[in-house]
A protein has these predicted regions:
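N-terminal small/glycine-rich loop or linker at the start of catalytic domains
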Residues: 22-48, 142, 146, 154-167
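Alpha-helix-loop-beta-strand connector modules within alpha/beta enzyme cores
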Residues: 34, 82-109
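Conserved anion-binding
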Residues: 116, 128-181
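Glycine-rich, proline-tolerant flexible connector loops at the mouths of alpha/beta enzymes
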Residues: 44, 69-91
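Conserved, mostly hydrophobic/aromatic
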Residues: 56, 63, 74, 138
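Acidic (Asp/Glu)-rich catalytic clusters
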Residues: 23-28, 64-65, 99-102, 126-136, ...
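Active-site mouth loops of central-metabolism enzymes
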Residues: 36-58, 111-121, 170-172
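Hydrophobic faces of well-ordered beta-strands that scaffold small-molecule active sites
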Residues: 32-36, 71-73, 105-111, 136-140
């Protein structure tokens, strides 16, 4: 197995020792990725998380200037920034604006790729809304996830959620869906 590894950095002390002795020129290339904002949670948990498109674009520029080669993008509902969105037009807009300012920054849109189940158990459409925006990378979540997610109250001046909400998340991707995506 080790013959197939580009580098084995499971032992952190080995990694630090190699870096200390040889410097960066002896290390394998790395891609620094910055996840701009969370998929479900936002400024209610960390005021530094950008939610609006303008703020995310600026954060992408700042990350690029700090050395990031890739940004991971989630979009928010412009009428309620406390809610995630799967609007393909929002992904297209943010990608276009980031590319205008940082043409060689790799854009990684979240895609999930699977389906969510409604309260009646019926599966929805494939979650691939970000793909028409033509990101260089799209994150696909290969898993089955049945969980509860706590959406925290958004304190003033944030709007969109006046109290904590517990929501159920039922997500699944099967072999056929993964092959289609």
């Amino acid at each position: 197995m080790e013959n197939y590894l580009v580098g084995d950095y499971r032992d952190a002390s080995y990694y630090v020792d190699k870096l200390y002795r040889g410097g960066l020129e002896n290390m394998h290339p790395a891609i620094i990725t910055c996840a701009l904002t969370g998929s479900f949670h936002g400024a209610e948990l960390n005021p530094n998380l950008p939610e609006a498109i303008d703020a995310q674009v600026q954060q992408a520029v700042d990350a690029y200037n700090a050395g990031a080669a890739m940004v991971h993008i989630h979009v928010r509902n412009p009428q309620n920034l406390g809610e995630p969105s799967s609007d393909p037009e929002l992904f297209a807009e943010i990608n276009r604006r980031i590319r205008e300012k940082c043409p060689d920054l790799i854009i990684n849109n979240t895609a999930m790729g699977g389906r969510t189940a409604g309260p009646d158990g019926r599966l929805g459409d494939l979650m691939v809304a970000s793909l028409p925006a033509r990101p260089e990378v799209a994150s696909i979540d290969v898993m089955a996830n049945y969980t509860k997610i706590l959406f925290k109250k958004r304190p003033a001046p944030l709007t969109g959620r006046d109290q904590d909400e517990m929501r159920r998340m039922h997500y699944v991707i099967d072999h056929d869906d993964a092959m289609e995506v």
